[in-house]
Amino acid sequence: PPPHPPSSAASDVYKRQAGKNAIGRVDLVENRFIGIKSRGVYETPGGTLLMHAHRAIESVTLDKDTMHKKEQAMPRYAELIYNGYWFSKERFKLQRIVDLKRKKVNGSVKLRLYKGNIIIHSRITKSPAYSMKKVSFEENKTFNKSNVERFINYHKKKLK
């Protein structure tokens, strides 16, 4: 898989295919920075495909805590950019975090497009955090079922 976004020619193909399948169009009312609401209709079929593909690879390469921290940081990151704070110290700090996390995210994704839906067909990566062998309870030698009670008791304390 390429280490950079696809070429312009490939991007045009993605945009056309996504557009034919009604992907990437959003109609929304936004809360503007200056305190008013405005309606916008945006069409980004190629960008929507790239976002779904990137998230599909993130889901198998990033661990739980990293994913959680990323999901918490991204709304703030987007808000800073939307409000014109591209050169702010806060945006630079968030960018450093994003860049560190992104080093683990690599691979390729096959997507199927059908009537407005993006279906993940396959994901391949050289640095998976996910392993089918580790999550199989039937044949898993690393998962000891007798530890379940201790695990539950430990986490139950958080509820008291």
Name these PLM-found stretches:
Residues 13:
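Active-site loops and adjacent core secondary-structure elements that bind or stabilize anionic groups
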Residues 18-160:
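Peripheral terminal appendages
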